[in-house]
């Protein structure tokens, strides 16, 4: 009960220090605490968008981790990504400064509000943003803590005036099951974070607890187009669950009459809620982002809006006001009339969804899909190697770089080159190529881009920075590139 105790004793001047404050999850919580009146500071190894944003508010940021950074702090917040040998952790333990996990701090914030927790292997960040837009359109100004930058706000977290809090619930280390939410959303469940869970069944069990831990008056929202989620929903009888999908005719909320282009998706929705007679049709809902997966994300938000009686007008207005999320199919530049897209996809299922969207758009433009993928983490590649071999079918031309380690040690035989070799050997793709250096992607674009093409730069590593610097890199070689964002 940290936050409640601080409030009761008026100890808001005590300093809360975040180790790894530049991380998207940590920076969001730090920003909310700062806006609530707490004294916040933090450290990180490098400067980034998040640290610069926090510094602009007056939050002190230390570059690098050192014992002296926590000289005058009362609490230390860490995430699961922080090495236990970190000098600031060692100093906090030595001085008996309370160390709080990021998920526990998030739980404290959520305990004070009526909370919506959004989880799932993919789509959490976009879904969280969409839900927030509907709340605002309904006249409820929520507090939001997201896993990505919401373009409407240019931040991943902001303090609202209502009693609602909407948060992305990270499932990577099972701490999300302890988050005190009233409404829980599950977008999908795929084999991910198996370095922590060890097996898929344990991961599924965590999602089961995520739902069953809801209070009796709460409800879950689940996508039953996903077979694992459907099975889970069928097994749970003690909590109210609202289902959604595109292919599932028995879902409570279904999208149909779907049309999508490079900038948006339009669809109709059929609503048949449990214990409610009759069916409601909402026609011509438009979301300003393409892709079937984003339509599913919007259905989750619609389910929450319908259950909370937001009304059809608020739902449509909320989506009209949505401006997307940074690094989710973000068009960053144009070269030779080809679109260059920056996307966070780093799991095989995310890659398939992103490339399917790109393929649909490219076909309408008589173009091709050029995929440049930077794998993220050796452990993920090892666990999902076979899935990675099969997820690039919608790319007409494929380039794979070496693996972005994200702090992990190399694993023998697990490299970007070995993935390309296996894809080629097993004939899963006839135009798969290895990029020895990310900078070689500039030449790939110069040599291959043509009018109507979709150039998709994917990964959770530094490929995003590269994509956003393409105008300068192309200009330095004498080629003109139009920057979009």
UniProtKB/Swiss-Prot annotation:
GO terms for cellular component: cytoplasm. It catalyses: UDP-N-acetyl-alpha-D-muramate + L-alanine + ATP = UDP-N-acetyl-alpha-D-muramoyl-L-alanine + ADP + phosphate + H(+). Gene3D superfamilies: Mur ligase, C-terminal domain, Mur-like, catalytic domain, NAD(P)-binding Rossmann-like Domain. It is found in: Cytoplasm. Keywords: ATP-binding, Cell cycle, Cell division, Cell shape, Cell wall biogenesis/degradation, Cytoplasm, Ligase, Nucleotide-binding, Peptidoglycan synthesis. The keyword Cell inner membrane does not apply. It holds the Pfam family Mur_ligase_M. GO terms for molecular function: ATP binding; UDP-N-acetylmuramate-L-alanine ligase activity. It comes from Rickettsia rickettsii (strain Sheila Smith). The gene is murC. Cell wall formation. ATP binds at residues 120-126. Belongs to the MurCDEF family. This is UDP-N-acetylmuramate--L-alanine ligase. The keyword Cell division applies.
């Amino acid at each position: 009960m940290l936050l409640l105790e601080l409030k009761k004793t008026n100890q808001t001047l005590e300093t809360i220090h975040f180790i790894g404050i530049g991380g998207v999850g940590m920076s969001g919580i730090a920003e909310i605490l700062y806006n609530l009146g707490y004294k916040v500071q933090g450290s990180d190894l490098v400067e980034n968008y998040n640290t610069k944003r926090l510094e602009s508010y007056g939050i002190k940021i230390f570059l690098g981790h050192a014992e002296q950074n926590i000289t005058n702090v009362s609490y230390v917040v860490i995430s699961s990504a922080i090495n236990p040998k970190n000098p600031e952790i060692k100093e906090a333990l030595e001085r008996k400064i309370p160390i709080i996990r990021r998920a526990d701090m998030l739980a404290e914030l959520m305990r004070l509000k009526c909370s919506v927790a959004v989880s799932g292997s993919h789509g959490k960040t976009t879904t969280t943003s969409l839900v927030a837009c509907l709340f605002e359109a309904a006249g409820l100004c929520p507090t939001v803590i997201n896993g990505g930058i919401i373009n409407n706000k240019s931040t991943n977290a902001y303090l609202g005036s209502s009693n609602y809090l909407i948060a992305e619930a990270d499932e990577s280390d099972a701490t999300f099951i302890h988050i005190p939410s009233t409404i829980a959303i599950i977008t999908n469940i795929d084999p991910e974070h198996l370095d922590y869970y060890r097996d898929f069944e344990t991961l599924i069990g965590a999602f089961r607890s995520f739902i069953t831990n809801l209070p009796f008056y709460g409800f879950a929202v689940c996508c039953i187009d996903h077979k694992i989620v459907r099975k889970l929903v069928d097994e749970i009888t003690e909590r109210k669950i609202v289902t959604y999908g595109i292919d599932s005719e028995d879902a409570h909320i279904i999208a149909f009459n779907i049309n999508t282009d490079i900038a948006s998706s339009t669809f109709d929705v059929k609503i048949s809620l449990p214990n409610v007679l009759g069916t409601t049709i909402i026609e011509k809902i438009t979301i300003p982002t393409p892709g079937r997966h984003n339509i599913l994300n919007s259905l989750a938000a619609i389910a929450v809006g319908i259950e909370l009686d937001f009304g059809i007008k608020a739902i449509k207005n909320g989506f009209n006001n949505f401006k997307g999320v940074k690094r989710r199919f973000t068009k960053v530049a144009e070269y030779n009339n080809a679109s260059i897209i920056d996307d966070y996809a780093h799991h095989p299922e995310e890659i398939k969804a992103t490339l399917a969207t790109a393929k649909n758009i490219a076909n309408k433009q008589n173009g091709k899909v050029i995929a440049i993928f930077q794998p993220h983490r050796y452990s993920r590649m090892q666990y999902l190697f076979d899935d990675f071999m099969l997820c690039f079918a919608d790319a007409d031309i494929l380039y794979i770089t070496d693996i972005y380690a994200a702090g992990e040690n190399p694993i023998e035989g697990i490299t970007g080159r070995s993935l390309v070799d296996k894809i080629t050997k097993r004939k899963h793709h006839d135009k798969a190529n290895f990029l020895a250096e990310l900078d070689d992607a500039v030449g790939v674009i110069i040599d291959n881009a043509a009018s109507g093409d979709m150039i998709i730069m994917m990964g959770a590593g530094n490929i995003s920075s590269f994509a956003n610097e393409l105008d300068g890199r192309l200009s330095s070689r004498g080629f003109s590139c139009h920057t979009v964002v």
